[in-house]
């Protein structure tokens, strides 16, 4: 299964990559409520059947073990939900989406943690691959159930969603740089607010996805290969602000080429 993706993993390993992160754009369609990998026709809750949470956790553990056994590649990290707070991911059938509330994420992570412990697996479970930094410390175009993520997962007072003492879950939040790159004043301000909240709860931070998209109006959007200095300086500015002000300990690019 997924031979193309697995071939890319092998090619990356052959070229010296030694850390691998897996993430989910959707649970398998046979576990989803609408039978699709998109969230079409639904709101901002997990597209996962109520009786399939345990099955989903077992599936993820099986995949991590299977890839290591068959391909010799160990997933060091796995994130069960990708951009669960995204305001785009229930609008229509355009894109795979993985919306979920903080409670649904916490339930899944606890089950996956137990599965890993039972199998003596040390793969780290990452949260939350947020689509927007603002959802990590407040709300933005969503309600409280999918916002305030740092507080929800790492403040002990959040008894329903606290994951700070969960095995295989590091004190680390993952987020994507999209939507917060302009204007310049907000580029810095949002990252300073993010860092203040992370520091308050003693949580680290990785920036795990960004690229030039059509909404990057300052440089005219991103299509094809763009080798211009204007775009290079724009990307450098994002990297600088993510590392200096948000103190990202890891910074990851998404797509090498953008096309329509």
Tell where the protein language model's regions lie, with residue ranges:
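Catalytic metal-binding/acid-base residues of hydrolase active sites
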Residues: 84-85, 131, 174, 178-179, ...
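Glycoside hydrolase catalytic-domain groove-lining segments
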Residues: 7, 114, 118, 122-125, ...
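Structural recognition of the beta-strand scaffold that forms the well-ordered cores
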Residues: 19-24, 76-80, 124-127, 171-175, ...
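Extracytoplasmic/secreted cell-surface and envelope-processing proteins
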Residues: 30-32, 87-90, 134-137, 181-189, ...
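Structural recognition of alpha->loop->beta junctions
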Residues: 72-75, 153-173, 231-250
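A general structural signal for short secondary-structure junctions and capping/turn motifs
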Residues: 10-14, 196-198, 240-245
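Aromatic/acidic polysaccharide-binding cleft in carbohydrate-active enzymes
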Residues: 204-260
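Substrate-binding cleft and catalytic face of glycoside hydrolase catalytic domains
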Residues: 1-168
């Amino acid at each position: 299964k997924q031979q193309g993706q697995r071939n890319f993993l092998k090619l990356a390993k052959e070229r010296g990559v030694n850390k691998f992160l897996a993430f989910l754009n959707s649970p398998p369609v046979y576990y989803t409520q609408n039978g699709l990998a998109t969230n079409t026709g639904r709101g901002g809750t997990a597209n996962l059947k109520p009786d399939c949470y345990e099955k989903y956790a077992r599936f993820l553990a099986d995949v991590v073990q299977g890839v290591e056994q068959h391909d010799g590649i160990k997933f060091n990290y796995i994130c069960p939900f990708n951009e669960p707070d995204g305001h785009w991911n229930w609008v229509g059938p355009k894109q795979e989406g993985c919306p979920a509330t903080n409670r649904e994420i916490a339930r899944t992570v606890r089950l996956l943690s137990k599965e890993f412990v039972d199998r003596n697996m040390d793969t780290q479970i990452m949260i939350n691959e947020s689509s927007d930094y603002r959802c990590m410390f407040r709300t933005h175009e969503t309600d409280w159930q999918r916002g305030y993520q740092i507080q929800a997962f790492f403040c002990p007072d959040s008894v329903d969603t606290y994951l700070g003492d969960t095995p295989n879950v590091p004190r680390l939040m993952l987020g994507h740089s999209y939507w917060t790159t302009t204007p310049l004043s907000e580029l810095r301000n949002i990252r300073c607010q993010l860092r203040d909240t992370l520091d308050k709860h003693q949580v680290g931070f990785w920036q795990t996805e960004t690229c030039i998209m059509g909404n990057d109006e300052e440089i005219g959007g991103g299509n094809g290969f763009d080798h211009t200095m204007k775009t290079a300086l724009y990307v450098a500015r994002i990297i600088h602000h993510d590392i200096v002000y948000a103190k990202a300990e890891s910074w990851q690019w998404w797509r090498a080429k953008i096309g329509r």
